[in-house]
Amino acid sequence: MIKVRRNRKDREVLAMKQVKMMSLNAREKDNALNEVRLLASIDAPNVISYKTAFFQETGNTLCILMEYADGGDLSGLIQKKKETKRRFSENFIWQVAFDILQGLRTLHDNKVIHRDIKPANIFFVGGVAKLGDLNVSKVMEGKYASTQTGTPYYTPPEIWNNQKYDGRVDVWSLGCVLYELAKLQPPFLARDFPGLSRKVTAGYY
């Protein structure tokens, strides 16, 4: 759950993400704490900035305060375009590509793979596109990772095939997002996961 809060000291508007820990399994709890660690370690213009985090014993809730995205997220913008039957301009698509590639460069330079690039995780602050939601991101300890994660429509072949992967999976996912901006639908569509997997691994769209 995301709420909007205002800092009492400087009146800055912030987003507060509330995670009810009691309702999570062990892996989900690790992901929530992982997001705090990663946000605190990254300071970049194209990554949503972290402010602080605290734990509310009442309700057993982890609260993460971060930069507020006044322009919402990309999934909301796509939905509006679908409703009005209008397209994004080419300049807008190029700007999103540039901004997010800058964010990915920062993450990858810090040996972090985002692993869940999708419209809902791309936010806009003052017109600038920024990466957010790092809860399934991973700090690379070696050359490759192998854990299956991500959102199916934007998941690259390596993960579908249970192969080892590196930061290039984020570039694949971004490519899927940019395709969706141009066509207003993801490049790979299917009725079920097996069908989606076959299309992605064959490169058939």
Locate the predicted segments by residue:
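AlphaC helix of the protein kinase catalytic domain
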Residues: 75-87
